[in-house]
Amino acid sequence: MRVLLFLLLSLFMLPAFSADNLLRWHDAQHFTVQASTPLKAKRAWKLCALYPSLKDSYWLSLNYGMQEAARRYGVDLKVLEAGGYSQLATQQAQIDQCKQWGAEAILLGSSTTSFPDLQKQVASLPVIELVNAIDAPQVKSRVGVPWFQMGYQPGRYLVQWAHGKPLNVLLMPGPDNAGGSKEMVEGFRAAIAGSPVRIVDIALGDNDIEIQRNLLQEMLERHPEIDVVAGTAIAAEAAMGEGRNLKTPLTVVSFYLSHQVYRGLKRGRVIMAASDQMVWQGELAVEQAIRQLQGQSVSDNVSPPILVLTPKNADREHIRRSLSPGGFRPVYFYQHTSAAKK
């Protein structure tokens, strides 16, 4: 087994990995490099995926990866979204819909940090945990980067970028008690410890552009000394828009990538964004479900490597496995046909 490594990746270190190598996570700070292996679906398995929402392009890109993998492997895919975070009852009802459809595996992107009675509800159906951890004992495999790292990497970048200069940071990590918000804050705090980078406040709210914009305006009124906004892609989008109205533009850092954040990088309005390569994660989730259904070995937690993107290196080649193509619309149902499998 390769030596466990503390994840201090930058984009320029990624060539040390093979293009298709994965990371198998042992905890939030240690991983083993794992080679990808070929896969062939033995039949048209029926997979049902649940997302918190598709109003955030993070999940849209993941949806693209899933439907591409479903087409590649010749399996059926049904997708349901809850309309937002903290929608436990909705997602519980959606699992029942998956079962009525005849799903053979559930790919669960939870809208909450826990999912009570999951074992009772799914019975013997395999569950692949998708992006958001719920720490349920019946979940045998998770696809996703530890959210700790998605906060740590931006924090580490800011410390290096500041060159010892004090920075006053507003953190906007997303919804309270969901979506990895707590873990991203913990990662950011760990990265800036001992540096002059200071967290002024933490603003929690759903990943909705109006909610994030209102939160940002409220925080800027309360803390006029804020000069950096670090948070979700939706928060970054709000900060880019708000910056136009300020004498001194806000410095913007995003904990993950979206189409808007990518455009911000290209225009120099976002100085850094982490990417956990969402399209690739969607593909991985489908692959893990197929392996589990076929009795093959699956790792307990795998993900693509994290990319650290800046205006200097944000190009199409580096984001091709991160973002869905322009014009892509959500695919809620993909059904295998003989032609599709060829």
From Swiss-Prot:
Gene Ontology BP term (one): anaerobic respiration
Organism superkingdom: Bacteria
Signal peptide start and end residues: 1-18
Pfam families: Peripla_BP_1 (PF00532)
GO molecular function, one term: transcription cis-regulatory region binding
Family in the record: Belongs to the bacterial solute-binding protein 2 family.
Subcellular location: Periplasm
Record protein name field: Periplasmic protein TorT
